[in-house]
Design a protein with these regions (language model features):
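Core structural elements
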Residues: 150, 173, 475, 662-675, ...
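Alpha-helical recognition segments enriched in aromatics with Gly/Pro capping
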Residues: 227, 362-374, 481-483, 491, ...
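Catalytic adenosine-cofactor/nucleotide-binding cores of aminoacyl-tRNA synthetases and other
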Residues: 417-421, 606-693, 791-794, 840-843
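Acidic, turn-prone loop/beta-hairpin segments
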Residues: 105, 194, 198, 204-212, ...
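N-terminal, positively charged nucleic-acid-binding surface of large information/translation enzymes
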Residues: 2-280, 348-361, 365-383, 404-443, ...
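Short cysteine-rich clusters marking metal-coordination/redox-active sites
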Residues: 197, 418, 492, 528-531, ...
Length: 945
């Protein structure tokens, strides 16, 4: 029959094909549709439905570290919350009852500063109670804004009942936590040097301190030896000339508080003599630093008079360079080094942690002549009423005037700054309340828990928090602020002892706070609580460090809420929290219960640009979160987070987001194909037993099961980038690059209810059930969009489901997995040859090709098993297998050569295969024999593909 006759007699066979059909849209339009879905979810109380589905199941508790209730959320917040949501959803899939209770940190300075901008400072334009009321209102507004943004990301949680550190009940329980720590004797008052911000007017926690470069005046100052005979006896040389032990410091303003000069017991020192304008002068300097110091003093030719170690000079008396009525001792300290400066350290216990620590050993006076605003107090020995930074040049000038300034150089160095004001802080001794690290073994207990009880992801987190706790000072928990949880202590005016009824008083105050909030403490007098004892006791008016608020949520939240429990399975935050929330939580839990509050810590990196720079508006690389969601939708953002290896810094750029968008489309298109080809399939009546499936369908279920095991393990180990990799690889290689292309012919052209089609649909049904679950913790919106489109789906939400039990054939398959891998390799080799033939204009599509294979014996064994069905695997119209010979073109497979030519015959109007028997049946013009059987007969039978 001629081509003209074929065209004239053509019949439209489209109606005889099983074409795919689904309501699952090709275009996601996530940025618009996600908002609608969210509204439906929360109207339907989705979170409560998830909880109801897990009643009686073993709990998994991820405890939410509270973000601060101030400002809009950014990409870093999104990374944190999405990671938490992925974990909660994957643990729910694993059958756990995994509640998620979000929280907010509500007290503290940042909110005070915002409120001050609106209503003024306390005591100037507004009273404290009114100020606290405004702080509470401001925090609530910020929480509402952040809650909306977090929900938009698809984070499922108890958003209507979050924990807030300013809730009356939680404020009361923070009180109670403090009481338990005090009862266990971990709290002590003290006049100790603390990080102090002059702008905040308050002490700062370690976590509130950042290091930035600062320009300072570095000076070398001489402390004169008072008794040269004493010195002579110590160093075994007759000393006649003026002798200075020289200190080097970058904080001249601390010199009025100096109480000693520290040397190291084992460092070698030298007594050297030089000639100055005033005559002969002796210096005591660390041996390794003599040359650099003498050069700094612009002097020459030092003569060494004696060598000795620092221990020889212990308790030698020195003259303070500025205060004629003060003499100070030489002391020994382990903190002294000989790598810079002079090897001698100016020691002011009121202005430094090391100074304070070594001062305790020598019973040195803790003197603090500086007020909270950085101004010398009226009682200061010199420069009273001057700001310390204005006094600095005057101190330097005074030292020069008395001949004690040996060098003055400006330097740039790393110096602690206030995290809020970005201004340099000072170390200042003030009466504060501390959690002692060593009084009751808190440090050792915490280190033991780190070593034995806590899992770290990644494992370097262990060394980081361990080193921080090993070296940290006592925790100053008191603050001089208005908006914070008070410290409900009564201190005896004479003895400084706490009231003997402190535990009972804390509970009494806590009960009042449950009803009235923290104003219940601030608005009452001491005698309202302790009656006539008020004449002998002062009520503490300090507030708690906000890190204590959040650090005690293991007690105030996990132990108080029925759906939660302590210790938590996991705390998850950014890497900065090793010195913040992770540490404050560990210390308070050890102080209360002598156990860690978490079983595992997960740390994620920060978001940076493609060059590793921090995202910031000032650098011009900041990407607003709403812009990302507009481009990718929340699901695209979630895929970006999950695809990143959070153990390192997480790069963000438009190019990266574009790649994520491509990955999302690939997954979505695969999912759409799966759903579309389940058209007309009812699992209850149409599904086949897995042992009755065609070999290819059994193989793909086996592969799906292997992928599922990889994915489940990756979720359990919190390797979400591995989940994404396995998911996309399955889409690209197993499904898109192999299985789905092969089954199209069977799906579309065999009889609708044939074993051949139902076998493929059965496999597709099982795969889509598993596939949607795999993606649901990450691509939550898309998974739920697809979920109700799975035939005969019973559960309303994928989020109440558990991992799918993928069926795998128990009997020996016709082809082994190794055989299928061989076929995949052959298919790849054939495709390359067809592509070459297409480029040479020998063939058009794959179905217009005839493929001849020359295969060695082992390959033939596999290929010949499939007989005529081999063409369906290779997606060609005709395949011929020959014994191996040097024919055709060589391939990358050993023992395989291929030749591609145009297939013989005509193109079937229905299946598009080119076959000799097309148009050989007058009643069915344009059809091949196989299609005639599928249209009018019992349908073809498949065994392999």
């Amino acid at each position: 029959m001629s081509d003209k006759q074929t065209t004239e007699n053509a019949v439209d066979y489209k109606a005889t094909l099983n074409l795919p059909d689904t309501q699952f849209a090709m275009k996601a339009n996530l940025a618009v549709r996600e908002v609608k879905w969210l509204e439906e979810w929360y109207t339907d109380n989705i979170y409560q439905q998830i909880r109801a589905s897990r009643i009686g199941k073993k709990k998994y508790i991820l405890h939410d570290g509270p973000p601060y209730a101030n400002g809009t959320i950014h990409l870093g917040h999104a990374v944190n919350k999405v990671l938490k949501d992925i974990i909660v959803k994957s643990r729910t899939l694993a059958g756990f009852d995994a509640p998620y209770v979000p929280g907010w940190d509500c007290h503290g300075l940042p909110i005070e500063l915002k409120v001050e901008e609106k209503v003024g400072k306390v005591g100037e334009k507004v009273d404290a109670a009114t100020f606290r009321k405004h702080c509470r209102e401001y925090a609530l507004k910020q929480i509402d804004l952040q809650r909306t943004d977090f929900k938009r990301l698809g984070i499922l949680g108890d958003w209507d009942n979050p924990y807030l550190t300013m809730n009356y009940k939680q404020e009361a329980d923070i009180f109670r936590a403090l009481g338990l720590i005090q009862k266990n004797d971990h709290i002590q008052p003290g006049l100790k040097p603390v990080n102090w911000c002059m702008d905040c007017g308050s002490a700062l926690a370690e976590a509130e301190v950042e290091y930035e470069d600062k320009k300072s005046d570095a000076i070398d100052v001489g402390f004169g030896v008072v008794d040269l005979k004493d010195l002579s006896a110590r160093v075994n040389v007759d000393v006649q000339d003026p002798t200075d032990i020289v200190i080097w410091t970058t904080t001249p303003w601390t010199l009025p508080a100096n109480q000693a000069v520290a040397l190291h017991a084992e460092i070698e020192y030298q007594l050297v003599q030089v000639t100055t304008e005033r005559g002969k002068q002796n210096f005591i300097l660390a041996k390794d630093l003599v040359a650099s110091a003498i050069e700094r003093y612009k002097l020459e030719n030092p003569v060494v008079l004696a060598d000795f170690t620092g221990s020889a000079l212990e308790n030698l008396t020195l003259q303070h360079p500025l205060l004629t009525d003060r003499q100070v001792p030489v002391i020994l300290g382990e903190h002294v080094i000989a790598t810079s400066g002079t090897g001698a350290v100016h020691t002011a216990p009121g202005h430094g942690a090391d100074d304070y620590k070594v001062g305790l050993q020598y019973n040195l006076k803790v003197e603090n002549p500086v007020g909270g605003n950085g101004v010398y107090l009226p009682t200061a020995p010199i420069f009273a009423g001057e700001h310390i930074y204005k006094a600095n040049p005057k101190i330097i000038e005074a030292l020069g005037a008395v001949g004690r300034l040996w060098a003055h150089q400006p330097i740039k160095h790393s110096y602690p700054h206030c995290w809020r004001h970005k201004t340099p802080i000072i170390f200042r001794a003030t009466p504060q309340w501390f959690i002692s690290m060593d009084q009751k073994g808190l440090r050792d207990g915490a280190l033991n828990a780190i070593e034995n009880d806590i899992e770290f992801v990644p494992n370097w987190g262990k060394n980081r928090i361990e080193s921080m706790i090993e070296g940290r000072p006592d925790w100053c928990i008191s603050r001089q602020r208005t908006w914070g949880v008070p410290i409900p202590f009564f201190v005896h005016k004479d003895t400084n002892e706490l009231h003997p009824r402190t535990p009972e008083l804390i509970e009494e105050v806590a009960k009042l706070i449950e009803q009235e909030g923290i104003d219940a403490w601030f608005n009452r007098d001491a005698k309202d609580f302790i009656g006539e004892d008020a004449e002998q006791y002062n009520a503490v008016r300090d507030t708690l460090d906000v890190w204590f608020d959040s650090g005690t949520t293991h007690y105030a939240v996990l132990e108080q809420r029925e759906e939660l429990e302590s210790p938590a399975d996991l705390y998850l935050e950014g890497s900065d929290q090793h010195r913040g929330w992770f540490q404050s939580s560990l210390l308070t839990s050890m102080a209360i219960h002598n156990r860690a509050p978490y079983k595992a810590l997960l740390t994620h990196g920060f978001t940076v640009d493609e060059n590793g720079r921090k995202l910031s508006k000032s650098l011009g690389n900041y990407i607003p979160l709403e812009e990302i969601i507009k481009q990718l939708g929340a699901d695209g953002l979630r895929l970006y987070v999950a695809s990143s290896d959070y153990r390192y810094e997480i790069a963000a750029s438009k190019e990266i987001f574009s790649r994520v968008s491509d990955s999302y489309r690939r997954i979505r298109n695969t999912l759409r194909f799966l759903l579309a080809n389940l058209n007309g399939f009812k699992p209850s009546t149409d599904a086949l037993a897995v042992d009755d499936l065609i070999a290819l369908d059994q193989y793909i279920l086996q592969r799906a099961n292997e992928v599922q095991q990889t994915i489940i393990t990756a979720y359990e180990e919190m390797n979400f980038h591995v989940v994404c990799s396995a998911l996309t690889s399955f889409c690209i290689n197993d499904l898109g690059g192999f299985y789905l292309d092969i089954i199209k012919d069977r799906q579309y052209t065999t009889k609708a209810d044939s074993q051949a089609r139902r076998s493929a649909q059965t496999a597709l049904y099982h795969i889509v059930q598993a596939f949607v679950r795999w993606m649901s913790p990450i691509l939550s919106f898309t998974a739920q969009e697809a979920w109700p489109l799975i035939p005969e789906q019973t559960d309303k939400y994928v989020f109440t489901a558990e991992w799918y039990d993928l069926p795998v054939s128990s009997k020996a398959n016709l082809l082994s997995e190794a055989d299928w891998q061989t076929l995949i390799s052959v298919k790849s080799a054939v495709n390359k040859q067809i592509e070459s033939a297409r480029n040479a204009k020998l063939v058009g599509s794959n179905l217009s090709a005839k493929v001849e294979l020359w295969a060695n014996e082992s390959l033939q064994t596999v290929l010949n098993q499939l007989a005529d069905e081999l063409r369906f695997v290779l997606i060609t119209s005709q395949v011929v297998v020959h014994p191996f010979a040097e024919q055709g073109e060589a391939t990358e497979m050993e023992g395989l050569r291929v030749q591609v030519s145009a297939a013989e015959g005509e193109k079937c109007a229905r299946c598009w295969h080119v076959l000799p028997d097309v148009n050989t049946h007058a009643d069915h013009p344009g059809l091949c024999g196989r299609c005639i059987v599928n249209v009018t007969g019992r349908g073809e039978v498949r065994k392999y593909a």
